[in-house]
Amino acid sequence: MQIAQFYTDAFFSDCEKLGIKRPEIVVPATSCIDTFIHMVEVLLEKGYAYIAGGNVYFDTSKLENYYVFGNMEEESLAVGVRDSVEEDENKRSKSDFVLWFTKSKFDDQELKWDSPWGVGYPGWHIECSGISIKYLGEYLDIHCGGIDNAFPHHTNEIAQSEAYLGHPWCKYWFHVLHLLDARGKMSKSKGDFLTVSLLEEKGYAPLVYRMFCLQSHYRKPLTFSFESLDNTATAYKKLVSRIAALKNEGEHDEAAMEPLRASFRAALENDLNTSLALTALYDVLKAQLSDADKLALIKEFDEVLSLGLLKAAKALREEQNAQKSAVPEGMTAEEAAEIEALIAKRTEARKAKDWATADAIRDALAARHIVVKDTPQGITWSVQG
C-alpha cells in the first residue's frame, strides 16, 4: 500500500504542475471490493458469467455486439493484448475475460480478499466499472482514455457494465491518440517515455508541455521532439510577455468581446479542437479591444486551457520591476543584464573548472569596477567607485 500511495502522490503532484484539476472523488480500488464482488454475483445470476479453473469469467458470447468500437473482427484478434500474454485454457472464448481471480499466473500477488469463489482479487476491468457506478451512478456522459484502452479495456467495461445494469451505460467515448517520437509510439514497456520530472530537469516548465499537447488535436498522433518543445517554450514565453504588457484599463465593449468568445466556444464544440482554441486566444491579443477587455477574455479562455497565463504574466512583471529597481544608478537595464549574463557565464566556467575563462570574465568585470561577492543567498554584485 505504501508503493501505491507513493505513485498516487507522484501522479497528483504531476497533475498539479500540468494544470490538471484534482477530481472531487478519489478512492482506491481496495476500498470497493464489496462492490466488485456484488457485481460479479449479479453477472453470474444473470448468466453473463461462468466459473472455470477457480476464476470467474465474463461470457462475451452472450452479447450481440461485443466489439462495440468496430474495426475489430473476432478472427483477426490475437489471444491477449501483448505477445507476452499466454492463452488462458479456462476461457470458453478467447475474448472472455476474468472478473475475479482465485488462481492466476501471479503467484506473488499480495493483496487478496475473501469471496464466494475463494480467496482472490478482482479483474482489471471490473474495478473501473465498479468504482464508476458506485460513485457516479448508472449513467455516464463521457468516459475517456488512451486509444489503446479502447480494446480490450473499454470494450470489456461496456460489456460488464451494461450486462450488470441492464441498460446503456455511457453516451460518449473520448480516446486520445498516441504520443510518438522519431521511432514510433512512446511507451513505458519500450523504455522510452517522458516524465514531468525529466522535463523539469531539462529546464522545461510543465505548462509548456501542456501547451505543446494543446497545439494538436486529440484524434491525431502527436510526434514529440525537444526541438518542437523548444519552439513551444519560445511561443509560450512570447505569449506571456505580450499579456504582461497589457494594462487593466480602457473602456468595456461587450459587443466587441462576444464574437471572440463565440470563436473560442466554436473551437471547443468542434470535437474539442484545442488548436483552434489557441488560435482564438491569439486573436484576442490582435483584436481592437481595450487592454482590460483583453485581460478579461484571456482569463475566461485560460480557465479552459489552464496554461497559467495570468499568473505567469504577473510573475514576469514582478521580475521586470525587480530588475529595474536593482539597476545601479547611472547604469542602463541593458548594461545590468549584460553584467548578469557575464556573472552567470563565470559561474558555469567555475563549475566546469575552466579557470581561464572564469579569470578572464573576472578581469573584464573588474575593469568595469564591478565587485562580485559570493554570499549564502547567492552571488551579488555592485559598482565600486
Predicted regions and their residues:
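Conserved acidic
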Residues: 2-3, 120, 273, 338
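Alpha-helical recognition segments enriched in aromatics with Gly/Pro capping
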Residues: 6-13, 18, 22, 33-245
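The substrate-binding groove and active-site-proximal loops of carbohydrate-active enzymes
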Residues: 1, 24-30, 118
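Generic structural signal for residues in well-ordered beta-strands
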Residues: 24-26, 142, 372, 381
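Aromatic- and histidine-enriched alpha-helix N-cap/loop-to-helix transition segments
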Residues: 31, 123-127, 272, 276-279
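Structural preference for alpha-helix termini/caps and helix-kink/transition segments
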Residues: 185-188, 193-385
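N-terminal, positively charged nucleic-acid-binding surface of large information/translation enzymes
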Residues: 1-19, 372-377, 381
